[in-house]
């Protein structure tokens, strides 16, 4: 009988560490607006046993669903979408969360830096797109260039920024290569 060894994946592992840290901190609800670029994010959160995932095809509806989950539970909800205008559709719910001091952790998938600014479809400048409506924002490194401890640290900062003094939404932009 042979034992199988888990296969390490340089893209998935930091994202899974991020999701696991949020779960360890008390996050329970994740709202996913599916898209191809956000697949690694969606899979990492969906497969974590302590997290409940809710699939919402319409991003605007997803944003308000996550807002309602966070209001009802008092815990941050995670919101995940693909790149481009999908992220723009979250803005109304993020503005509402900002003014109502509702914690949300918004994770937007994006193209890697070398593919930005070329006029490709579903491409907008996502870095800082929610500016004054979030407590903290980060344009993260490409996951394969990132360590699991750094991912856990980013998750902790996102969580603490969302639930700390002046509770509200935070934004993490995830550049993902296909």
Feature locations, PLM:
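N-terminal alpha/beta PP-like core and its mobile active-site loop of ThDP/TPP-dependent enzymes
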Residues: 2-178
């Amino acid at each position: 009988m042979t034992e199988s060894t888990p296969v390490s994946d340089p893209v998935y592992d930091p994202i899974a560490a991020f999701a696991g840290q949020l779960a360890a901190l008390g996050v329970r609800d994740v709202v996913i607006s599916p898209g191809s670029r956000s697949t690694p994010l969606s899979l990492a959160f969906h497969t974590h046993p302590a997290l409940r995932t809710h699939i919402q095809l319409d991003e605007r509806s997803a944003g308000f669903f996550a807002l309602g989950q966070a209001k009802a539970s008092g815990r941050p909800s995670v919101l995940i979408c693909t790149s481009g205008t999908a992220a723009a559709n979250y803005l109304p719910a993020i503005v509402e969360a900002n003014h109502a001091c509702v914690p949300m952790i918004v994770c937007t998938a994006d193209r890697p830096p070398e593919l930005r600014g070329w006029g490709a479809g579903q491409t907008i400048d996502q870095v800082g797109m929610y500016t004054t409506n979030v407590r903290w924002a980060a344009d993260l490194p490409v996951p394969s260039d990132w360590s699991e401890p750094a991912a856990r640290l980013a998750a902790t900062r996102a969580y603490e920024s969302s639930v700390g003094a002046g509770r509200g939404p935070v934004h993490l932009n995830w550049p993902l290569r296909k």
